[in-house]
UniProtKB/Swiss-Prot annotation:
PANTHER family: URIDINE KINASE (PTHR10285). GO terms for biological process: coenzyme A biosynthetic process. This is Pantothenate kinase. One of its GO terms (cellular component) is cytoplasm. It comes from Actinobacillus pleuropneumoniae serotype 7 (strain AP76). Disulfide bonds: none annotated. It is an enzyme of class 2 (transferase). Keywords: ATP-binding, Coenzyme A biosynthesis, Cytoplasm, Kinase, Nucleotide-binding, Transferase. Its EC number is 2.7.1.33. The gene is coaA. InterPro entries: P-loop_NTPase, PanK, PRK/URK. It catalyses: (R)-pantothenate + ATP = (R)-4'-phosphopantothenate + ADP + H(+). Pathway: Cofactor biosynthesis; coenzyme A biosynthesis; CoA from (R)-pantothenate: step 1/5.
Length: 316
């Protein structure tokens, strides 16, 4: 039995790293070190061992879910006596700023596009559905960026609804971390892929997070499998500050960068600034809006100090 024993009532099965790795079975590792490098986040050093131990078992599990989903679609369309449109399988990945959601999303995209057969897997981030910078400034929301009210949630819900309706050539806005803004007139086009991975802070949130923007459906209503990437807040803050310091020496040095002025800070000033941003914005958003959505996920990946995933929780 590959489960950790607990007397606590929980909707999750809990696996340690070793037991989860055993569930890989015979799934082949097709990624090389060269393939892995461009998938990693700015402040992450993830190994092929992590891919084999954590992400290959996860890819195997998701493939089982996809197979069952296709069977259910076939049954429904047979019952309705209608032709079967191509409806992508949607995976969502949520979690805090600096936890490594984007890296997890890119690794899953690479694995699921190669095994068990070649498939088209699109990756979309919800950053593109933030309001443009001018709108955030007009609404006095710059210090609330990433909070529920900073998103055009109706547009995001329409986007995922169109995907699940089998529509073609659906446009997703593109966000630039350099300019801190939506790129005008540029889009990612989703055209009936096999899988869509939707990554962002808000993909598990519900109507309680949007009291001033009521609607009857949420992003999670259209998601087939949801993942939450978790870590202790102390680690998240530490990783955020480390990433900020690296950006200060690289991306922020670009004169076109929105945060170019941070490149002129001393190291101690940069640490204080990053710590303050975490406490006043990212940490607050984590406590109020992101962390409360964790228990809605189908799978929780819990990271330790070295960014390696130590525990996996799978909804029963």
């Amino acid at each position: 039995m590959s489960l950790q024993k607990s007397n606590k009532i929980t909707p999750f099965l809990t696996f340690d790293r070793q037991k989860w790795a055993e569930l890989r079975k015979s799934v082949p590792l097709k990624l090389t070190e060269q393939d892995l490098k461009p998938l990693l986040g700015f402040n992450e050093d993830l190994s092929l061992d992590e891919v084999s131990t954590i992400y290959l078992p996860l890819a195997r599990l998701i493939n089982y879910y996809i197979e069952e989903n296709l069977k259910r679609q076939t049954v429904l369309h047979r019952f309705l006596d209608v032709a079967s449109p191509k409806v992508p399988y949607i995976i969502s990945i949520a979690g805090s700023v600096s936890v490594g959601k984007s890296t997890s999303a890119r690794i899953l995209q690479a694995l699921l596009s190669q095994w068990p057969s070649e498939r088209k897997v699109d990756l979309i981030t919800t950053d593109g559905f933030l309001y443009p910078l001018t709108t955030l400034q007009e609404k006095d929301l710059l210090k609330r960026k990433g909070f529920p009210e900073s998103y055009d949630i109706h547009r995001l819900i329409q986007f995922v609804s169109d995907i699940k309706s089998g529509k073609r050539h659906i446009q997703a806005p593109i966000y630039s971390h350099l300019t801190y803004d939506i790129i005008p007139d540029q889009y990612n086009v989703v055209d009936q892929p096999d899988i869509v991975i939707l990554e962002g802070l808000n993909v598990l949130q519900s109507g309680m997070n949007y009291p001033s923007s009521p609607h009857n459906v949420f992003v999670s209503d259209f998601v087939d499998f949801s993942i939450y990437v978790d870590a202790d807040e102390d680690l998240l803050k530490e990783w955020y500050i480390a990433r900020f310091l690296k950006f200060r020496r690289s991306a922020f040095s670009d004169p076109n960068a929105y945060f170019h002025h941070y490149s002129k800070l001393s190291e101690q000033e940069a640490i204080r600034t990053a710590s303050s941003i975490w406490d006043e914005i990212n940490g607050l958003n984590l406590k109020q809006n992101i962390l409360p959505s964790r228990e809605r996920a189908n799978l929780i990946l819990i990271k330790g100090e070295d960014h390696a995933i130590q525990t996996v929780k799978l909804r029963k």
